[in-house]
Structure formats: C-alpha cells, structure tokens
Amino acid sequence: MARIIRRPLNLTAAVRFRLSPLSPFSGNSGSINSETTSWSELIRVPSLVEGCDYKHWLVLMKPPNGYPTRNHIVQSFVETLAMALGSEEEAKRSIYSVSTKYYYAFGCRIHEPLTYKIRSLPDVKWVLPDSFIVDGDNRYGGEPFVDGEVVPYDEKYHADWLRDQTDEDAKSGVVKKKHRRKRKKKLI
C-alpha cells in the first residue's frame, strides 16, 4: 500500500493500460466510430492490489497549512468525512486509522459510491481502496483510531512505510543530504 501512496499514478496507469481498448501500437487509429471505455464504466481489477475489499478506503489529504497539532489534524479528517456522511459521530465510527506524520491520510469504512463525493471535498487529494499491510493479516497501516479517538503515537504504526521508503531509496540510488547549519564567522 505504501507504494501506491508514494506513486498513485502507477495504479491509475496500470488500470488504464489494462482496461484500454486501444493499444498505442495497434493499427486502430481510434476513429469516431470505435468503442472506447468511459471512466465511469471501469471494472475492478482484483489482482491489481491484493487485500482490497472496496469497503475500506484510504483518503489522502493535502498537507495542512502551518504547524497544527496532531489532534487538530485528526479533527480536520473527521470534519472532512462528516461533510460526506452528514455527522461527526458517523464519521468517527467510520474512521479506523489516521496518519499525521509522514503523510496526511485516514482510513474509513464506507460504501464505494460515497468515494466519489469524498473526492470532491476540499483538501482531498486521492481516495484509494485500502489494503492489508500483509496479505491475510487484517491490519491496515497508520495509527489506529478506536472509539472516536486516535491512539497515542508510536513509530511502530509506520514501520512498514518507513521500511518501504528506505528500500525504495536504496533501489533508486538516492543519497539523502544531511542538512547542516551555516556557521557564523566570528568577527575579530
């Protein structure tokens, strides 16, 4: 799932490539009379993302302005989902995880048609089907949100994401620069 979060266009490209009736190398020029698949008619691709049930969704948000507290970020997630569901209580019951440190997102249990409404809300970047961290293990990523409250922060909730991030950096040969403070020259 972490790979989808970092590169959501890979998911889109894979779906489009797999469902596209026209190949860039085919002899079909895509004339007016040719049939094309409209985006509203796309079917699910179950083998694309394992562990997806299309009942659990990951809503990725734009980063907040300034430096709000963790509780303010979580409250903004609840308010965003409440716009779609109609009440904050319903939103709190629906949310099962949040992420407030490495990326801004929340996981929620909703029906698929509601995702279209959520996508149109302010500050929502993407709505993606959520999947288990480990196939067969009914555990989703992020910090658990239980009974309307987020559990105290612990780095273990992002261990898989951090490991994937480190693996991706190693594969791509990215060497991260350490920031250094500029030293002031002493005037003599």
From Swiss-Prot:
Gene Ontology CC: one annotated term: mitochondrion
Subcellular localization(s) per the UniProt record: Mitochondrion
Pfam families per UniProt: MORF_dom
Disordered: annotated segments: 169-188
Biased composition (Basic residues): 174-188
Keywords: Mitochondrion, mRNA processing, Transit peptide
One Gene Ontology term from the biological process aspect of the record: mRNA processing
Transit peptide: 1-20
Main localization category: mitochondrion
Family assignment from sequence similarity: Belongs to the MORF family.
Complexes and interactors: Heterodimers with MORF8/RIP1, MORF5/RIP5 and MORF6/RIP6.
PANTHER family, per the entry: MULTIPLE ORGANELLAR RNA EDITING FACTOR 2, CHLOROPLASTIC-RELATED-RELATED, MULTIPLE ORGANELLAR RNA EDITING FACTOR 7, MITOCHONDRIAL
Record's function text: Involved in organellar RNA editing. Required for the processing of few RNA editing sites in mitochondria.
Protein name per its UniProtKB record: Multiple organellar RNA editing factor 7, mitochondrial
Species this chain originates from: Arabidopsis thaliana (Mouse-ear cress)
Gene name per UniProt: MORF7
